[in-house]
Amino acid sequence: MNNNELYVSLDIGTSNTKVIVGEMTDDSLNIIGVGNVPSEGLKKGSIVDIDETVHSIRKAFDQAERMVGFPLRKAIVGVNGNYINIQDTNGVVAVSSENKEIQVEDVRRVMEAAQVVSVPHEQLIVDVIPKQFIVDGRDEITDPKKMLGVRLEVEGTLITGSKTILHNLLRCVERAGIEITDICLQPLAAGSAALSKDEKNLGVALIDIGGGSTTIAVFQNGHLTSTRVIPLGGENITKDISIGLRTSTEEAERVKKQLGHAYYDEASEDEIFEVTVIGTNQKQTFTQQEAANIIEARVEEILEIVSEELRSMGITDLPGGFVLTGGQAAMPGVMSLAQDVLQNNVRVASPNYIGVRDPQYMTGVGLIQFACRNARIQGRKIGFKMPEEAIQEIAVSSSEEQEQHHHQNEVQQRPKGKQKTQAEHNKQSKMKKLLSMFWE
């Protein structure tokens, strides 16, 4: 079995906390484990209870660990767009080696030089994202390692965030027993996975409609230029349904997930469902169209605020259109309504990997892909190998399965003789069970 590098991403959202385990083979990502649990301790994207957030993180990791069959102790952590600032930066260093071949250490030094800027006391540097490297005046270089030169420059994007919010996030992750290998801005990571090169060059807005908030990320000329966070999301839709149908939040959430439709004109009059009237045992019947009337109003409001925010940023033309992602983007009718409200090209982006083909996983997948690419350029190690005991256990399980299969073939070929017991026929290896759980 190949022992490739493994990477784990942690996406802490208002509604759900998600862990994704990926295996990188060259530039190809293979998802081997997922944890997804309801979040506790967050409101509108911000941590309001440390202990509850730690508990949610631990539960998500436990779920992912059961799928992969070994402990997970490291993760790439996503930071949402709340209280984030973006600015241009640059750094310059002299190439240090005698033969003037640019080494990993030179790339590290120039990235550190780009961080030597004055930031407000209440802000911390989250990351520097290189736009291009310049070697002796030659620009548009994506990876300068092994090139010859005397002077190495980098032009990049400096990302800073609220010191308090970042400290709270990192404290929660560390208290959950997880070592942080990298920190990435979520809109940037999601954009790296959801958007095409052409879209980012032309100008595109990535709209991540989450549970507690909606994040706008604008990409122009190939790079992230600005982000905004709107404190409205799926939880507001659930609350509206609860009020409109006079039912509990739990029932409203069920209606939203199972029968929700965001576009009244496309919703069904024939699709009928029942909910319990809150405070009574009485049932009341509604159609999908009646629920859509409630949902459409809130989603339309969110999209109109998105338009207003873009205008306030001075963005009036986006030839690349809009790309929707996040958990609420999967709801039927959202794309049709967005096309009406935004008056532009709109599509919904989902990861194209087995087990995570849903817009809610776009950020988690993007965190792995984005962090891997940046770490490779800067010569940083953020992955880890599968534990030796786990490899041996899988190898033993695989060997036992092959032996069992061979023995079954022998038994089938015998005209007479003692047959295998039912228990032996039902025996499954650990990996087989793991795979069957994953494919469900």
UniProtKB/Swiss-Prot annotation:
It is found in: Cell membrane. GO terms for cellular component: cell division site; cytoplasmic side of plasma membrane. It is a peripheral membrane protein. Keywords: Cell cycle, Cell division, Cell membrane, Membrane, Sporulation. The keyword Transferase does not apply. The keyword Hydrolase does not apply. Residues 396-440 are annotated as: Disordered. It holds the Pfam family FtsA. Induction: Transcription is controlled by three promoters. Two of these promoters, P1 and P3 are expressed mainly during vegetative growth. The third one, P2, is up-regulated around the onset of sporulation. Its main location: membrane. Disulfide bonds: none annotated. GO terms for molecular function: ATP hydrolysis activity. It comes from the Bacteria. InterPro entries: ATPase_NBD, Cell_div_FtsA, FtsA/MreB, SHS2_FtsA. One of its GO terms (biological process) is FtsZ-dependent cytokinesis. In B.subtilis, unlike the situation in E.coli, the role of FtsA in the recruitment of other division proteins to the division site appears to be an indirect one, through ensuring that FtsZ forms a proper ring. NCBIfam families: ftsA. Belongs to the FtsA/MreB family. Homodimer. Interacts with FtsZ. Cell division protein that is required for the assembly of the Z ring. May serve as a membrane anchor for the Z ring. Binds and hydrolyzes ATP. Also involved in sporulation. This is Cell division protein FtsA. The lineage of its organism: Bacteria, Bacillati, Bacillota, Bacilli, Bacillales. The gene is ftsA.
